[in-house]
Structure formats: structure tokens, C-alpha cells
Amino acid sequence: GLLGSIGNAIGAFIANKLKP
């Protein structure tokens, strides 16, 4: 759902910040 999509987007954003 929408909430899951937002969670995935945030997770990817954090992952990119931690491991560019």
C-alpha cells in the first residue's frame, strides 16, 4: 500500500545516505 511505499522510499534514502 501507500504506507509501505513510503517506508520503502525512506529506507532506500537512509541506505543511500549510510552507504553512498
Swiss-Prot record:
Distribution of this protein across tissues and organs: Expressed by the skin dorsal glands.
Signal sequence residues: none
Primary location group: secreted
GO molecular function: nitric-oxide synthase regulator activity
Any one Gene Ontology BP term: defense response
Lineage top rank: taxon: Eukaryota
Keyword Secreted attached: yes
Sorted UniProt keywords: Amphibian defense peptide, Secreted
GO cellular component: extracellular region
Protein localization: Secreted
Function: Has no antimicrobial activity. Strongly inhibits the formation of NO by neuronal nitric oxide synthase at micromolar concentrations. Acts by a non-competitive mechanism, probably by binding to calcium/calmodulin and as a consequence blocking calmodulin attachment to nNOS.
Identification of the protein by name: Dahlein-5.1
Organism: Ranoidea dahlii (Dahl's aquatic frog)
